[in-house]
Amino acid sequence: MTAIFLMSMLFGLACGQAMSFCIPTEYMMHVERKECAYCLTINTTICAGYCMTRDFNGKLFLPKYALSQDVCTYRDFMYKTVEIPGCPHHVTPYFSYPVAISCKCGKCNTDYSDCIHEAIKTNYCTKPQKSYVLEFSI
């Protein structure tokens, strides 16, 4: 009985480590420009979750490509564009942002992802919010 229990625990641990929990997750962001009168709250999806990584002890003897770790990043995404209300005529009022359709564990691609871990920025509006959002798919 103990052997069966131990084997099932090891199997569960192995499957849990092999599975990725990197999925599209709902995210609310606030967008404002200093020249515009209003702030927009945008509901979108981002890639978030856990990816299996390993930290090697012999880092001095490995090439740099072997030291990079997988992150939760976009597999498929599309861009949406919104118009920020209350902008003067000389300011472009459009803001484009990615919407995650599916995610994967992989190397961070700087072409479409911010790969630098920064200090937490404030994610709130400092200006009045406008209640409507115009979206344009690109």
UniProtKB/Swiss-Prot annotation:
Q: Which domain of life is it from?
A: Eukaryota
Q: Where in the cell is it found?
A: Secreted
Known glycosylation sites: N43
Q: An example Gene Ontology cellular component term from the record?
A: cytoplasm
The keyword Disulfide bond belongs to this UniProt entry's keyword annotation: yes
Disulfide-linked positions: C22-C72, C36-C87, C39-C125, C47-C103, C51-C105, C108-C115
Kindly give the InterPro entries that the UniProt entry links to this protein.
Cystine-knot_cytokine, Glyco_hormone_CN, Gonadotropin_bsu, Gonadotropin_bsu_CS
Q: Which GO terms describe its biological process?
A: G protein-coupled receptor signaling pathway
Q: Name one GO molecular function term.
A: hormone activity
Propeptide, residue positions = 133-138
- Pfam families listed in its UniProt record: Cys_knot (PF00007)
Quaternary data:
Heterodimer of a common alpha chain and a unique beta chain which confers biological specificity to thyrotropin, lutropin, follitropin and gonadotropin.
The family classification in the record reads:
Belongs to the glycoprotein hormones subunit beta family.
Protein's name according to its UniProt entry = Thyrotropin subunit beta
Q: Which organism is it from?
A: Sus scrofa
